[in-house]
Amino acid sequence: MQLANKQLLDPSNQLSDQRNKRRRLRFILQIAISAALGGFLFGYDTAVINGAVGEIGTAFTVSKETLGFAVASALLGSALGAFTAGWLSDRIGRRNSMLVAALMFLAGAIGSALAPTITTLIIWPVVGGLAVGFASVLAPAYLAEISPASMRGQLGSLQQLAIVIGIFLALLFDYVIVLFTSDQNPVSVIGPLAAWRWMFMSEIIPAALYAVLVTGIPESPRYLVQKGLTQRAKAVIEKTLNELADQVIARIQSSLVNTHQGKLSELFDRPHHPAADHLDRRDAGDLPAVSGPI
């Protein structure tokens, strides 16, 4: 007991603990910034097309209806991406899923910038939209699983901040590109491409950076425990959480046992409950009074 107290009061031990805390904090912030870059691309991808809407219609000579569908096509991909992100991350991991999202952001940006027809300009934003849907689900889930409880709220809000910054910088870059044209017209050419195409091309840099940074972050401990990779999970926990790794792993295992995997069909199932039946009958009896003359 006395030995333990001496170790706690030892200045060298306290200094070592402080260094470990600072090192752990820096590592967590690096992880959080890397993951939140997906939120930045979320905002950037959804906003960057705003500066090119009119010019796309002029370049491809399409109707307003077709142009509107081209602009909204990314939302279709976003819905599908958000719907499938959980399924994908449970199979290939959170980090690998974010890498897939980064590559989709990259492909969507290049494809949209070089699209030769309005049809391809509808298809490629769907690819980018898939990445938006992935990012909207994966980054918050990953940050929640890998960050300490004391920082979870702060790091979670980082995703929202990144989205807003992405929207702002996308619109700012659209404006800057227009200023670079001789007549301040987005249809004008800058180098080999029309100005509006550079607006899409500008997303390549943050998308490539996202792909690089994601490869350097650890996998979620929850996913590793779920796949039976407890030693790898323990190594990640020791780097990120100021808790005993074995206790954290035990909690994760317990939560995995008690977790119910929902199915799409459950949205349409009506659970049977006697109390609900009683309320239904009572409400049905009151219905004539409610629906009578007012």
Regions found by a protein language model. Give the residues of each.
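Transmembrane-helix signature of 12-pass secondary carriers
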Residues: Q2-I294
